[in-house]
C-alpha cells in the first residue's frame, strides 16, 4: 500500500457512517460532507455539505451512510439546536464500520477527522 503511515484510512472508496444523538427530543440542524469535494473552497457548497433539519432524541438517533474516497480529509458532521434546553449532542464518525472519532457538546457538536 502507498497510503501514508499517519493516515488512519487508506485512499479508495470507504463507507462512512455519521451518527448524531441527543439526551432530549428536538429539531436539529445537521451539516455533513456527503461526497468528496474537489478542494476545501468547495467543501461548504450544498452539493458536498448538505443540511438536514430533522427530529433527534434519545430513542431517535440520526444516522447517515455515504461513501468518501478520502474520509481522513473530508469526514465531517456537525449538529446544533435546542436553545431552550441543553440537549447534550453527541456525534460519531465510523469508517468501514470502525468508530474513528466521537465528540460530546452542549447545544452543538462537531466531529471531523482533521481540524476544520
Predicted feature descriptions by range:
Residues 10-23, 71-79:
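Noncatalytic modules at the cell exterior or secretory-pathway interfaces
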